[in-house]
Amino acid sequence: MMTPETLASLAAIAFASCWTPGPNNAMLASSGATFGLARTLPHLMGVALGFPVMAVIVGLFLGEAFQRSTLLQEGLRWGGAVLLLWVAWKIATAGGMGRAGSAPRPLRAHEAAAFQWINAKAWVMAIGTAAQFVRAEAPVTSALWIGGVFVVAGITSALGWAAGGAALGRFLATPARLAAFNRLMAAMIALGVVYMLAG
């Protein structure tokens, strides 16, 4: 069982890391603006539930192995960078076609959940929280607490970013405005990749 102080610390980290800009939030905002909140819900749930599942698994099994393997770290770093740049390109080139129905469909829940495993920010969050909050005397309980807190933080932040994008979608109803917004979201992802590679 976590102490109230430890739980408060975990919650602060979870909410701060889930609400700050990153690939998931940029993709959710872009999807909300392009497809609307209702069509973005599967994507939203994939992110909100996919990361906590990942965090529990990392907390129980993978965190220590990942911390010890430079090859795994570099593989994720560069593989994740390439994939995130591809995602940024797809968002940037989606332009303003979403309202006309010719844009690609929003992500499905299982696709958004799978994306967490190649998202560098997700790995940093999962390993960091595992290192700080998984206790050797109660690893399963600790990992489940981490997962539970991230479910709450993830649902609220994913909903906030997708709803924000959907609200902006009304303003972005013209193809030129939507294209500009999608390019801005793509630029946020690309800048995050540059920051990740520089760090």
Where are these regions (language model features)?
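Juxtamembrane transmembrane-helix termini in multi-pass membrane transport proteins
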Residues: 2-74, 128-146
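Interfacial loop-to-transmembrane junctions
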Residues: 163-187
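Hydrophobic/aromatic residues within the transmembrane alpha-helices of Major Facilitator Superfamily
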Residues: 15, 19, 52-53, 89, ...
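Juxtamembrane boundary at the C-terminal end of a transmembrane helix
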Residues: 5-6, 194-199
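Membrane helix-loop-helix hairpins that form the core translocation module of multi-pass transporters
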Residues: 38-108, 164, 171, 194
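Hydrophobic/small/kink-forming positions within alpha-helical transmembrane segments
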Residues: 48, 52, 56-57, 124, ...
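Selected transmembrane alpha-helices and immediately adjacent juxtamembrane segments
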Residues: 115-126
